[in-house]
């Protein structure tokens, strides 16, 4: 039997309710109360931790990310600091010179919106060829929805002047009618598979690296889509199941498993859905409807304000999308669909309503839910559709959303507080590695709606700023609700999992600008201390 008593603390129980201490026993919260009550209940055999007045919150539960890719990114070329394509070429050449055994160059860290004003352009196959023509080169945009690749990858994909169609994707052509090496959506996803695949041992190493970083920053659950993202599902499954069977993974894991077509949907339900190994389980089916705002591949009903001819990429035909949603509904499987643009959100939530009515008993979810108008938000509430927000996206998006969407639509988007006030179940995640998976940085964005430089001074559309308590609830209780675990996860109450974080500063009373710099001093998962500063 393991027992731990935390005392002399500020324990967040629920909105407006705090305690001084708690007792966990064998992975469950046994009691919450005063320091005296807990110490008298703990007994001689409990580990007793004096928190020195520090704040304790439930463990953060990232409701959508890609944790395998986070680990990969820690080992791969980082061009996030490059301010031109030419700098990326130089960085790529340097990386290969330092890593002569590299069999395929992969990165997903550049952002053209951060390029120097006189050097803003997208890379193409010629730029990638300038890095190497001997091995596959994949330069992915930070959003994960577009990429430049070299001629070798185009050749491996069989793309040329006469063959340049990929269902659910776009292959950009140059003036000569040949693919210029820039790919969107399903086309860039297929190109990733041309990079030599990781082994099971590679995947296990990447998982553990990313999870170590996660628990050091207070994450205790990851709801992650890794299924076929950067490795075949067989590799992903074997790595995960071996880690969790051996008890080596330090956090809980819920698989949001990508299904791009009906065949994959049938295979997922037949082979994996609902299966558990230790602290991991296979959960929702993840679908994709559109792309990203930054790459202008998010589906916009009326096009982009700064590019009216662009309306985004529809990644799945409506008849196939509806058939898959209906299939999952019939099997009792939660569907979580990537939708960023208002066009994607509108189509998808109407399909949810068509198959699930207003009850939505399987809690189908829209991931991202960025560009909306109030009629769409009301529809979401009326049909009990769940939302997974990534407030940390505002670090970048607050600088581009009005130019992409126009002022009026932008002011109805990223509507965190409105969704809360309407009673929509909205959870928080990071979509990492698109953004850092640090929960405190994410909370900062939800509460202040500013970038890390504190701009704009009043916050972007400050009417949608969240209170700290509501933001913490979205990151804990609501994330648990999305996985049907709200009765055992996301609160520090008797009968709940002993997943918690001790913070070095009181996020409920400190200057909101300081939240992003707050750090955990201890993280507990399932009653076990997995990180201690």
Please annotate each region the language model reported:
Residues 3-7, 15-17, 23-268, 292-327, ...:
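Divalent metal-binding segments
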Residues 326-336, 343-364, 369, 374-378, ...:
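His/Asp/Glu-enriched, well-ordered alpha-helical/loop segment
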Residues 244-247, 271-277, 359, 380-384:
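Acidic (Asp/Glu)-rich catalytic clusters
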Residues 32, 140, 224-225, 254-258, ...:
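Generic beta-strand/beta-sheet core signal
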Residues 63, 383, 498:
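An anion/phosphate-binding loop that grips the pyrophosphate of nucleotide cofactors and donors
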Residues 66, 279-297, 385-395:
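Non-cysteine beta-strand/loop elements that form the S-adenosyl-L-methionine
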């Amino acid at each position: 039997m393991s027992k731990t008593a935390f005392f002399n603390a500020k324990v967040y129980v629920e909105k407006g309710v705090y305690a001084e201490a708690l007792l966990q026993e064998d992975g469950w919260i046994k009691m919450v109360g005063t320091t005296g009550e807990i110490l008298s209940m703990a007994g001689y055999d409990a580990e007793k931790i004096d928190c020195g007045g520090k704040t304790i919150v439930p463990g953060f539960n990232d409701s959508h990310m890609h944790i395998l890719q986070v680990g990969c990114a820690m080992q791969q070329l980082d061009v996030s600091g490059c301010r031109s394509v030419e700098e990326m070429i130089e960085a790529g050449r340097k990386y290969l010179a330092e890593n002569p055994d590299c069999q395929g160059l992969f990165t997903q860290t550049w952002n053209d919106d951060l390029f120097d004003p006189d050097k803003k352009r997208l890379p193409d196959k010629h730029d990638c060829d300038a890095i190497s023509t001997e091995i596959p080169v994949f330069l992915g945009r930070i959003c994960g929805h577009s990429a430049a690749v070299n001629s070798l990858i185009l050749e491996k994909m069989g793309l040329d002047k006469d063959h340049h169609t990929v269902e659910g994707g776009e292959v950009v052509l140059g003036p000569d009618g040949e693919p210029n090496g820039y790919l969107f959506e399903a086309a860039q996803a297929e190109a990733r598979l041309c990079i030599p695949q990781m082994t099971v041992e590679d995947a296990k190493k990447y998982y553990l690296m990313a999870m170590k970083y996660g628990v050091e920053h207070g994450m205790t659950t990851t709801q992650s889509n890794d299924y076929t993202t950067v490795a075949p599902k067989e590799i992903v499954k074997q790595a995960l199941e071996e880690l969790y069977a051996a008890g080596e993974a330090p956090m809980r894991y819920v698989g949001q498993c990508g299904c791009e077509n009906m065949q994959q949907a049938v295979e997922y339900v037949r082979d994996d859905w609902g299966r558990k190994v230790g602290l991991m389980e296979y959960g929702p089916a993840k679908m994709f409807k559109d792309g990203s705002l930054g790459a202008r591949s998010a589906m916009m009903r009326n096009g982009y304000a700064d590019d009216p001819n662009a309306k985004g990429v529809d990644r799945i035909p409506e008849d196939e999308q509806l058939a898959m949603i209906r299939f999952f509904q019939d099997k009792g499987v939660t569907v979580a669909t990537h939708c960023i643009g208002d066009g994607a959100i509108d189509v998808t939530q109407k399909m949810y309503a068509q198959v699930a009515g207003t009850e939505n008993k399987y809690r189908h979810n829209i991931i991202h839910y960025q560009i909306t108008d109030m009629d769409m938000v009301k529809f979401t509430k009326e049909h009990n559709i769940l939302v997974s927000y990534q407030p940390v996206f505002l670090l970048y998006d607050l600088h581009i959303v009005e130019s992409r969407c126009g002022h009026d639509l932008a002011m109805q988007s990223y509507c965190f507080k409105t969704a809360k006030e309407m009673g929509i179940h909205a959870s928080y995640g990071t979509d990492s590695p698109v953004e850092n998976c640090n929960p405190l940085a994410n909370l900062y964005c939800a509460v202040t709606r500013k970038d890390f430089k504190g701009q704009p001074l009043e916050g972007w559309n400050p009417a949608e700023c969240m209170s700290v308590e509501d933001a913490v609830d979205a990151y804990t209780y609501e994330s648990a609700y999305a996985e049907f675990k709200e009765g055992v996860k996301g609160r520090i109450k008797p009968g709940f999992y002993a997943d918690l974080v001790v913070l070095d500063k009181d996020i409920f009373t400190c200057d909101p600008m300081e939240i992003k710099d707050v750090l955990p001093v201890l993280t507990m998962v399932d009653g076990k201390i997995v990180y201690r500063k």
